[in-house]
Amino acid sequence: NEGNVSPERVRALTQHFIDKGVKGVYVNGSSGECIYQGVEERKIIIENVMAVAKGKLTVINHVACNNTKDSVELAKHSESVGVDAIASIPPIYFRLPEYSIAAYWNTISEAAPNTDFVIYNIPQLAGTALTMSLFAEMMKNPRVVAVKNSSMPTQDIQMFKAAGKAAKGEFVVFNGPDEQFVAGRAIGADGGIGGTYGVMPELFLKLNYLIAAG
């Protein structure tokens, strides 16, 4: 009620996901209202997630801020607490050229040299889409291992999956929009990252099991 992050509730929620059989968590993303959180608040959140989840869940921490300095600070901190990967949307508000977005992402990635990097494509909110030319540029970064795709055309999943595999051999694509989970998995998404998964994890775990079982 005082507007502060509750470490106890962060830990309890993380344990809840473990108890439900969830395989991984995406921290400080859209559902976590990352844009409205300060750097120190986001550090507190990921520290308390890792206190419970380390070694039990795959943890991806979203580190993007609207300035590179804060994003780099969060990337370094993420690596120090042992996350499995960091993720980032492009800078928002001003539409930057692709070379600037690539420089932003690569600078963040370089700040966590031993940690995988996930591109977060959400053009309807970020204002910038992940084009194939920008994607190809990011494939030069050895730490880029996945895309979380929240664009509305579901076929983008197939496009990024095919291009990623061609560039790297193995490449992960996560379906973003919750309402497209089944369609996304059916056309090649390796998993899903979304908001309602945290509210009803049993449903989505069951759907994922049935899809995998054919």
What are these regions, as identified by a protein language model?
Residues 111, 123-214:
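Catalytic alpha/beta core domains of metabolic enzymes, predominantly
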Residues 1-129:
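Active-site beta->alpha loop and helix N-cap motifs at the rims of alpha/beta catalytic domains
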